UniProtKB/Swiss-Prot annotation:
Gene3D superfamilies reported in the protein's UniProt record: Glycerol uptake facilitator protein
InterPro entries for this protein: Aquaporin-like, MIP, MIP/Aquaporin, MIP_CS
Descriptive protein name: Aquaglyceroporin-2
Compositional bias (Polar residues): 11-24
Family (UniProt): Belongs to the MIP/aquaporin (TC 1.A.8) family.
UniProt lineage: Eukaryota, Fungi, Fungi incertae sedis, Mucoromycota, Glomeromycotina
Extracellular compartment spans: 81-86, 153-187, 241-271
Amino acid sequence: MADERGPINKSGPSSTYGATENNGESGGTRGAPATEDVIVIQDSGWYYIKFRFKEPFAEFLGTFILVAFGVGAIAQTVLSKGATGNWITIALGFGLGLALGIAVSGHYSGGHLNPAVTITLAIYRKFPWVKVPVYITAQVLGAFVAAAVIYLNYLPAIYNFAGDKRDVIGANATAGIFATYPQPFMSIGGAFFSEALGTFFLLFVILAMTDERNVPTTRIVAPITIGLTLTAIAISLGFETGFSLNAARDFGPRLFTFFIGYGVEVFTAYKFYFWIPLVAPIVGGLVAGFVYDSLLYWGEKSFLNKNVHHEHRAVA
């Protein structure tokens, strides 16, 4: 089966995809020569492309699912004027969207779906820095496309709600369906703290769920737990800023609204608030990584544990 070594180009039209060695411990006769199971493709077409770019494709699709369900829940609530949704349904939309997005993408990319997650794992878990811009680009694009799809789906309702106007602020504002905007009474410092705090909790749970020495989790338990964490954050901490907690989730849809007629106000509104969801979640994630690794994590991947080495010894 294919593994992380990726495609190996051979002479001629065929390509060999990955290989898993049989060392005699399983799947073969003990002591037999090492062999490899390979997938040989007779051309280097689409299969080659989707294998080579499986990680960004997975991040794109996972983030698309997260934002589509979350923004869709906001659209349904706002455009129906609360008749078919409320804050709880929005919180559930994002929580379920995150759980499903991780479930879809986790096997292929790890299911980051958030630049704060990617950067935190690069600093504290040795995630390759060369992949960081690729992951973040895929996440932003996934969020952008999700916003476009939800906009097209709800376009009749948007016209019914606001007519031809595309307002960022006001009674008929619809920009907040797609990107986050703070409550008018919030200061920049207060909004920054709120976004960082929410992301702290999210990343803390993610680090716990991916800690091999913590309670064992499965591909089902981890996404559900992380999704429920986002729902809990939304219910308890989300009111003041709209709980972006994710630069891609906010910037992708914000960029989309800029292009479709909401104008530069999507960036200038509320004292240029747009930079808060870009920076604060990353800060919150880094603090979460520092606290978790300082108090709980025993693994060797963290630079905080650079003097720790684990040895496997036979027990008499």
